[in-house]
């Protein structure tokens, strides 16, 4: 007989957040850490501030990591041992999902039934784990994809590998089973419906936010002084992981075109790249250095490692323009952070960047991949920088993590109420399971049986 569960409130008391492949404790801008890490950190902190406890489950990548870390009051990061600590690429993680899921279920089994009220999974790997946890705990699964394989494969960069069929199938399963699908933008919501057959009634748009207390306008001259940048320099800034998808090479080609059109810029133009290698293909700083040398702009290129948020804000303030030339972005938090600091953005007119940047008001969106078009857009921003800077601040001010969390809590509550109502009408039947778990569910259930 199943254990008796405590009565649930529709408003959650505790959320199990799943982030299998990357930890909220990792430094964004390196390896697999990026905007999703920022999202998990900011949302978790603000949920905790509202009295909703959060446990973040992530795969341990070192034996030195403590099993449990209090990230902030009310937010606990739980490092799960699942497979070798080191040497596993993201594409190898599906084989570790059974072990990861077993550990998550064991943790919940140590508590009174009904310990978690909601599961919120991030990325498709976590969604597969969340699907099984949802069925076992009888709680709603909220899923945020962050990126979608079908969309990424339609916009592959040179040197990048297509996402495997297994991921596509896994995403389709999670989309079919999640109680709510959270899309960053209306474009992403349409992609979920059109490419994955998502139920529009369960798909909601919740834009990410920006920390408006940390990313603020400031004195550009003072920021440059602190960073050792000449006051009269023209600084083009790229922030993010150095990988084909992010296309830092396109920024270098645009800078070379600017110099070809105006050689007098050579003494002032600088290209700052803040980030570290990730992914495949054109990923190493050395390769970007070789490209810069071939373009004749090696002396303009400056690499900086990923930095803490306070110093990152200084880099945004010191820049004339932030450039986000990605092949695709589900949103583009970097663009929003730059604008919050008063720095206008030149970005690709793709995906969520069409929402993150307001064309002609907070920056310029560029159609296509022609470096000449990017060079022209950068020049246009430089010519109107003060006006666009004011527009950037106003635009970013409309996005806050508080609004994001307002919408998420409403989604959690609505999904819980819907599940409670459905349970009154339920007819016993067979639950589907994730494909990777078929054949292993009985053993997994035995490991976590109460």
Swiss-Prot record:
EC number: 2.4.1.250
Example GO BP: mycothiol biosynthetic process
This protein's UniProt keywords: Glycosyltransferase, Magnesium, Metal-binding, Transferase
Class of this enzyme: transferase
Listed GO MF terms: acetylglucosaminyltransferase activity; D-inositol-3-phosphate glycosyltransferase activity; magnesium ion binding
Binding-site residues for UDP-N-acetyl-alpha-D-glucosamine, renumbered to this chain: 27-28, 35, 241, 246, 307, 329, 337
Catalytic activity field: 1D-myo-inositol 3-phosphate + UDP-N-acetyl-alpha-D-glucosamine = 1D-myo-inositol 2-acetamido-2-deoxy-alpha-D-glucopyranoside 3-phosphate + UDP + H(+)
Subunit structure: Homodimer.
Described purpose of this protein according to its UniProt entry: Catalyzes the transfer of a N-acetyl-glucosamine moiety to 1D-myo-inositol 3-phosphate to produce 1D-myo-inositol 2-acetamido-2-deoxy-glucopyranoside 3-phosphate in the mycothiol biosynthesis pathway.
Protein name: D-inositol 3-phosphate glycosyltransferase
Source organism (scientific name): Geodermatophilus obscurus (strain ATCC 25078 / DSM 43160 / JCM 3152 / CCUG 61914 / KCC A-0152 / KCTC 9177 / NBRC 13315 / NRRL B-3577 / G-20)
Taxonomic lineage of the native organism: Bacteria, Bacillati, Actinomycetota, Actinomycetes, Geodermatophilales
